[in-house]
Every structure is written in C-alpha cells, then in structure tokens.
Amino acid sequence: MADFLGMMKQAAQLQSKMQAMQEELGSLEVEGISGGGLVAVRMTAKMEVKGIKIDPSLLKPDEAEILEDLLVTAHGDARRKAEAAMQEKMQAITGKLGLPPGFGFG
C-alpha cells in the first residue's frame, strides 16, 4: 500500500513538473538560420513561429525561389533546435524518475 501511495505522489509530482515544463517550452525560443544568415526563423520550443528575418538582398522578384528554399531550410533548422530543447527538458524531468534510457515520454 505504501508503494502505491508513493507512486501516486510521484505521478502527481511528475504531472506538476510536466505542466511547468510546457510553460517553459512556450517561452523558450530558438533561431534557425540559413543562407549564412540571410534568412532566420525564430520559434518557441512548442514549434510556434515567432518571427522571420529576411535580408533585403533576397527581396527581388528573381530571388523568389532562392528565398523560398532558404525559408524552408531555416524553418527546418529552427524546428530541429526546438525539438532538441524539448527533449533536453523532458530528460531533465524523466531522468529523475530512474527510468531506463529511451523509456521517457515523447
């Protein structure tokens, strides 16, 4: 019975930590860059795009295809960084539970 109560307490603590992590991920921003800095995409670790910067040299009609490619690349870079930040936060929480490697959430 004591083990069950301990597990319930641990589950409640985990839920509280997960909620705090979700809030933190919403405010944690990463930046993806492409074209040597010609294009940058800022997003939260919850994958919400917050801003896009485009070098004025790319704002020409004949540069549209290049700009499109750079935007896709910068977005992908930002997404990978956001996913890495989320995994890092998850490991910080689930690592304290003593779960085997790869058994965390997400």
From Swiss-Prot:
Q: What GO molecular function terms would the record report? A: DNA binding
Quote the Gene3D superfamilies the UniProt record gives. Answer: Nucleoid-associated protein YbaB-like domain (3.30.1310.10)
Matching InterPro entries: YbaB-like_sf, YbaB/EbfC
Q: Which HAMAP family match?
A: DNA_YbaB_EbfC (MF_00274)
What is the documented function of this protein? Binds to DNA and alters its conformation. May be involved in regulation of gene expression, nucleoid organization and DNA protection.
Q: How does it assemble?
A: Homodimer.
Q: What is this protein called?
A: Nucleoid-associated protein BBta_7345
Q: Which organism is it from?
A: Bradyrhizobium sp. (strain BTAi1 / ATCC BAA-1182)
